[in-house]
Amino acid sequence: MASKAFILIETAVGKTREVASTLKSVEGMQSVEVVTGPYDVIAVIDAPDINTMGTLVTEKIHTLSGVVRTVTCVAVGA
């Protein structure tokens, strides 16, 4: 079952645009936006299942230089 999530990302000072640019090339990213507020970037990801989503977040997002913290909000329906 396909899974969708919103990833709220806090970046290191001066790294926001670099992180956003790198995220756009990661497979599974539906959209990446630089935003204002307590988070610097919001990414929307699609994955075939929750395990793949977890791997994407922990291995592709958490490991990026400039990423300080993330919050993953899994979509549960409308």
Regions found by a protein language model. Name each.
Residues 1-78:
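A compositional/biophysical signature of low hydrophobicity enriched in polar/charged and small residues
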